[in-house]
Amino acid sequence: MATEKKLEELFHHTLQDIYYAEKQILKAIPKMAAGAKSPELKKAFEHHKDQTEVHVTRLEDVFKMIGQPAKGVKCDAIEGILKEGEGALEDFGK
């Protein structure tokens, strides 16, 4: 029984990590799209934004199914990736 509880907690925490990451990506995509030089890349960012919105909605559905509020917890991995992306935008903007 204790193992089931631990797995449930791990699942919930992982959902929170993913939810946080997807929400942060949604915030970052407009900045990345604005920094894109080619129309094709801008379009790709818009498409990715649409897909990410679907991911967020699906995650919110999963939270409802398990009876938990849709809430993220800070994910250091996505923070690092987004920081790297900001650096790339600065480098290419020069």
Segments from the language model and where they lie:
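Amphipathic alpha-helical hairpins
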Residues: M1-K94
